[in-house]
Regions:
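Basic, glycine-enriched DNA-binding surface that flanks or lies within the catalytic cores of DNA
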Residues: 2-109
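Phosphate-handling DNA/RNA-contact segment within nucleic-acid enzymes
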Residues: 64-177
């Protein structure tokens, strides 16, 4: 992908100013748009299908006409998983040609927000198994590596902190899972 950006630094996408395209498990053309973001991590199509409700492509339209696109994992509060409070961003190429940008979208609630996903749509409060990760990519890779040996993994809840775990993130999950 040619580098068309003139700015010196990649800025995170503001969650209030981005267009989001969901992965469509039935539309091969839409799936192809996501492939570059998963290929370098070895995340196969089966794993993408398992988590298809829990990631999107976020696009920020810049004033100079170019677009910043990245793979985004929506973050929610444990007590209200239907309300997106931020995005864990991955996969945007950096201007210097090095590794891709990873971080949190501008405006994200990084203190309390978490990526909370379950292939079987198991609610957090009903989960028998919860797996914690520092990134959603790592959670998906873990699922992919172990799904054949552990059929129950589909019912588990996978959580990404998007970086370092905070006390509020931990408390939020514990409040929903400990009777």
């Amino acid at each position: 992908v040619p580098n068309l950006y003139l700015q010196l630094e990649m800025l995170p996408i503001d969650i209030t100013e981005s267009d989001n395209q969901k992965f469509d498990s039935k539309d091969r053309e839409v799936q192809k748009k996501f492939a570059p973001y998963f290929k370098h991590r070895g995340i196969d199509l089966g794993t993408q299908h398992a988590f298809y409700r829990d990631f999107c492509l976020a696009t920020r339209h810049c004033e100079d006409g170019h677009r910043d696109i990245c793979l985004a994992f929506p973050m929610a509060l444990p007590q209200n998983t239907d309300r997106i409070v931020g995005f864990e961003e991955c996969g945007r190429a950096r201007l210097d040609g090095q590794d891709s940008y990873k971080g949190m979208a501008e405006g994200s609630n990084t203190d309390e927000g978490l990526w909370i996903a379950s292939p079987a749509r198991t609610p957090l409060a009903e989960a028998k198994h919860i797996y914690w990760f520092g990134s959603a990519y790592d959670a998906m890779a873990f699922y992919q590596l172990h799904r054949a040996q552990n059929q129950e993994l589909r019912k588990a809840v996978f959580i990404s902190t998007g970086g370092d775990l905070t006390e509020k993130q931990m408390r939020g999950v514990l409040e929903q899972t400990i009777p």
